[in-house]
């Protein structure tokens, strides 16, 4: 037994205070997980000794567990969870049993109902501590996600539809003649048709891919036959690496020249009869500002160039009409719009898709294959080699269908949040915004900034400690970072899921973080 001499009375007096202190950790000044565990360890020690003094006087681990379970069973609804965790946390010593039992006593004091979890999946007390940490932060000052430009939370309706797809119709498409496969194929093609309707396109123009990166790489591979030595590929300094590297590498392979414009006007001035491809982002993932892709695609078409638009950011905050934009290619991912990762779209204009050859080969995209030759399926199927992500396609189509019912209101809310955010950031001393378009009644979907004397990584790390998720780094846009004369930046990207109150708390937390990172005069 632990030596309780001289400390029992103190523990009995301090135990309620210790519990109250831990409950107070739900507030905005919540600690990191490590600090949280330190608090729990002290609480566990106090609570165990107090319980021991009240009558559990045994070194026998089974007797200890039995008596504690009996006691806990009279006090809370976690009895089953208690038994499960004792079993699965490797409670092979008195110390481990004490930890398991008293973590659960703490859960009860904090009002955490563990019955909603499958406790058989908890294999260590560290995992149990992490679960309690997450639960205590699910309060009025919950974790605030502001990195939607990277990946958006999956919509509940998407999760429900994906679950139904897996449970009720999880069969390969375009292969079997049995009923389940035919149902799966019909669902897959309906999802394709719904995506096409949303984009004002036709189903045969919609190619499902693994995401925007694969879409753009596939476009570059497909278009390699259109590029020869001495030709030019035109892009901008604002591109995400996914719409820069494929064209850079294509130019290197073909002996062509990659021309990089520094503005929309500069891009237009660089168009020539040598331009074969114009690759441009619809919306910058760093600045959050839009390009007039309709005008740029028109100018590209007038010179005989093929236009490729990266819509990864734009699709999340606007409703692109591809007939109106009149581009040749358009690419985006599902995970930016509330669907899952691993699914995306490559739109290819009908008059062009029929002339193109596939760049990936395998099952599902071939009509006939002999030792010497083969013939391919018609578009878009010839561009979908292998088993497609038909479950992901359901998620993507569901996300677009769900959003289309209320998107005008959602987009308006986002712009209101962005204007509020950018205004608040603009008022912070020493903070340099890379774009303040929202303050000039222009659409802006994210805000990136640097701060004199503070490294973006430090800012993001400290904001995380305060419960805010933001992105820091080069944002997969090194050419733009070089053009702007910086190495890294902090990016804040809210969505319609956020609130004005969360933006206000973020701005307050940021100012507190900057007091740590910088002196009062903004210097290191």
What kind of region is each of these model predictions?
Residues 1-139:
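Flexible, low-complexity inter-domain linkers and amphipathic docking helices that mediate domain-domain
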Residues 133, 137-524:
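Pyridoxal 5′-phosphate
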């Amino acid at each position: 037994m632990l030596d309780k001499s001289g400390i029992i009375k103190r523990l009995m007096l301090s135990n309620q205070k210790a519990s109250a202190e831990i409950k107070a950790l739900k507030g905005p000044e919540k600690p990191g997980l490590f600090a949280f565990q330190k608090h729990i360890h002290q609480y566990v020690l106090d609570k165990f000794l107090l319980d021991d003094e009240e009558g559990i006087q045994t070194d026998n681990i089974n007797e200890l567990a039995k008596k504690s379970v009996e006691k806990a069973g009279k006090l809370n609804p976690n009895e089953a969870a208690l038994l499960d965790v004792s079993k699965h946390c490797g409670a092979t010593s008195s110390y481990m049993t004490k930890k398991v039992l008293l973590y659960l006593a703490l859960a009860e004091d904090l009002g955490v109902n563990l019955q909603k979890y499958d406790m058989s999946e908890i294999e260590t007390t560290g995992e149990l501590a992490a679960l309690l940490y997450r639960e205590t932060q699910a309060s009025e000052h919950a974790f605030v996600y502001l990195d939607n430009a990277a990946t958006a939370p999956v919509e509940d309706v998407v999760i429900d539809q994906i679950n139904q797809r897996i449970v009720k119709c999880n069969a390969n498409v375009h292969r079997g003649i049995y009923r389940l496969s035919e149902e799966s194929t019909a669902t897959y093609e309906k999802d394709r048709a719904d995506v096409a309707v949303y984009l004002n396109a036709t189903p045969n123009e919609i190619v499902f891919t693994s995401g925007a990166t694969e879409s753009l790489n596939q476009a570059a591979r497909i278009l390699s036959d259109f590029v020869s030595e001495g030709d030019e590929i035109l892009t901008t300094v604002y591109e995400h690496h996914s719409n820069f590297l494929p064209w850079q590498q294509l130019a290197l392979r073909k002996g062509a020249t990659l021309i990089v414009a520094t503005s929309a006007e500069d891009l237009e001035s660089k168009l020539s009869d040598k331009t074969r491809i114009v690759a441009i982002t619809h919306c910058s993932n760093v600045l959050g500002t839009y390009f007039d892709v309709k005008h740029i695609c028109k100018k590209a078409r007038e010179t005989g160039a093929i236009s490729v638009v990266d819509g990864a950011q734009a699709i999340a905050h606007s409703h692109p009409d591809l007939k109106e934009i009149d581009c040749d290619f358009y690419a985006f991912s599902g995970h930016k719009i509330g669907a899952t990762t691993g699914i995306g779209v490559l739109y290819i204009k009908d008059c062009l898709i029929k002339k193109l050859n596939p760049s990936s080969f395998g099952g599902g995209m071939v009509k006939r294959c002999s030792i010497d030759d083969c013939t391919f399926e018609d578009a878009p199927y010839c561009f979908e080699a292998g088993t497609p992500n038909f479950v992901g396609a359901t998620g993507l189509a569901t996300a677009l269908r769900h959003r289309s019912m209320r998107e005008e209101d959602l987009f308006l809310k986002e712009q209101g949040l962005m204007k509020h955010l950018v205004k608040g950031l603009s008022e912070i001393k020493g903070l340099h915004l890379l774009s303040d378009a929202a303050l000039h009644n222009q659409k802006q979907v994210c805000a990136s900034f640097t701060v004199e004397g503070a490294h973006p990584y430090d800012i993001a790390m400290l904001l995380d400690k305060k419960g805010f998720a933001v992105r820091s780094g080069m944002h997969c846009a090194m050419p733009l970072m070089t053009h702007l004369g910086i190495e890294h930046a902090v990016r804040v990207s809210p969505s319609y899921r956020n609130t004005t109150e969360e933006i206000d708390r973020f701005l307050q937390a940021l100012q507190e973080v900057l007091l740590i990172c910088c002196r009062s005069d903004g210097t290191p």
